[in-house]
Amino acid sequence: YAAWKNPGIKLTDFNYKVENGQAIVNSTYDLKEVSAKLYLTYQINNQGAVKVTQKMVADKNAKVSPMFRFGMQMVMPKSFEKISYYGRGPIENYSDRNHCTDLGIYNQNVSDQFYPYIRPQENGNKTDIRWWKQVNMAGNGLMFVAEAPFSASALHYTIASLDDGTEKKQSHSFEVEEADLTNLLIDKAQMG
């Protein structure tokens, strides 16, 4: 999976226009190390709603390890502590082990998502999500809705601090320091 951790991403095209009262921003990225192109489109209306379309086209003949995740990461202020979502819960679950969880509406805190496994690793994921709200104590924040169910997680840890590659600097979860941020992951697909 190493190629996907640093795919050699390079912006190759960027343009924007205003159409039917919406700002439309298009960007194209070359992912040299994995022989792929990534296309992102942001449609922003005058009410503050943003529709994001993400598409990747890979060279079918490229010899690249399987992709472990396809989605987006958003680093938010730590104060975005409150989570509400409609999906599987209340405990963490992944696509290969989510049948022990119930579909429902859950209200949780980011601080409660991290589970201190002996060996540090990503955790706290939720699947089959229809909508996800990430807000601060005043109720201000963002809501994510997709055309198909998605996965999400929010932690006060960076991905790198939980999985820094083949040479782990920390051997136990208690050695990983909590970051002064909320790291939100919204994924279309993830290996579980």
What residues fall within each predicted segment?
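Beta-strand/loop-rich accessory regions of lumenal/periplasmic or secreted enzymes
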Residues: 1-192
